A protein has these predicted regions:
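Nucleotide-activated chemistry modules centered on ATP-dependent adenylation/adenylyltransferase
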Residues: 7-308
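Short, glycine-rich nucleotide/cofactor-binding loops
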Residues: 1-7
Length: 308
């Protein structure tokens, strides 16, 4: 089971544990944050080394730009190799259905920078593995039927990982500064995870995780506008769909403990009146999708746990 240090993989790990499935928590690279999360699970672990070619950094020095590589595809291939070598029959990732939807760019159309986290890649790669590598090796995402909000709801059921997890991508930059704390509080991932968790956990707990209330800071307005697809497009980050952000914000606007925060109040006054009320309901976004590669018997056991 791949672990990335964020909420998604921890939801998968605990779901499999509750279903009685033996698992090895696996990560690629040397992140100490991921190691701490993996050790926190108390399960067997596997850390696979991956070293970037020094020529890449030489190209940087010569002026070459860094590009976004399909890192989930790379890691999927590495973990399939590890599974074959170790005689394991399943490789499990934690990509939710929201990953299949990109950013809507004016004049261009949809651009999905996280395509290798989406359903099209999972289906194609999983079929390739079974046709050409090992017929009995299942590759799938355990969270594919779930939206980001459904994953957040599941994560909020336990505080066991509150002091260990982080979805902030600045923790994983190869070059440049990393946040002193686990959450930088200003990137799209921090913005979205805070918003996604807010409807499902006590405010005091969420603020304790992040160290501050991101929704009561007017300087974060531009970042949240992008998540809401208000006068901007969804960021090129692994965040939920615009409709999920809008529904989460509308939910908070109706809650006494959130509605006075400056960005929630701004949403209620400026953005919500332009939206159809029936598109702001959170419940329809928590319904499971039927498109996934999870083995049927396992999904039946997991489904009840996710729905509870």
């Amino acid at each position: 089971v791949a672990i990335g240090g964020g909420k998604d993989s921890l939801v998968s790990i605990e779901a499999l544990r509750n279903a009685g499935v033996a698992e090895t928590v696996t990560w690629i690279g040397g992140s100490q944050l991921i190691r701490a999360c993996a050790e926190r699970t108390g399960l067997p672990t596997l850390n696979i080394g991956r070293t970037l070619a020094p020529e890449l950094f030489e190209l940087n020095r010569q002026g070459a730009w860094n590009g976004h590589i399909p890192v989930t595809a790379v890691n999927s291939a590495i973990m399939v190799l590890a599974a074959v070598v170790q005689g394991v029959d399943q490789v499990v990732f934690s990509n939710e259905r929201s990953a299949s939807y990109g950013s809507q760019i004016a004049g261009t159309g949809e651009v999905n920078h996280q395509w290798s986290k989406g359903w099209a890649f999972e289906k194609a790669f999983g079929e390739y593995v079974q046709q050409h590598i090992a017929a009995d090796l299942n590759y799938y995402s355990l969270l594919r039927p779930l939206s980001e909000l459904a994953v957040a709801r599941q994560f909020a059921k336990t505080d066991f990982y509150d002091a260990h997890f982080s979805s902030c991508n600045r923790n994983f930059h190869i070059l440049g500064e990393r946040p002193v704390n686990r959450w930088c509080g200003v990137c799209p991932k921090c913005h979205f995870v805070f918003l996604a968790l807010a409807p499902f956990m006590p405010k005091i707990r969420l603020v304790r995780i992040f160290g501050r209330n991101l929704l009561d800071d007017m300087e974060q307005a531009g970042g949240y506008d992008a998540l809401l697809e208000f006068q901007d497009h969804k960021p090129f980050e692994c965040v939920g769909e615009g409709k999920e952000s809008r529904a989460a914000m509308a939910t908070l606007a109706s809650r006494p403990d959130w509605k006075e925060d400056v960005l929630v109040k701004r949403f209620a006054n400026l953005i919500q009146p332009t939206l159809a009320a029936d598109e702001l309901q959170i419940e329809p976004l928590l319904v499971f999708d039927g498109e996934h590669r999870i083995p049927a018997a396992l999904w039946e056991r997991l489904r009840a746990n996710f729905a509870a």
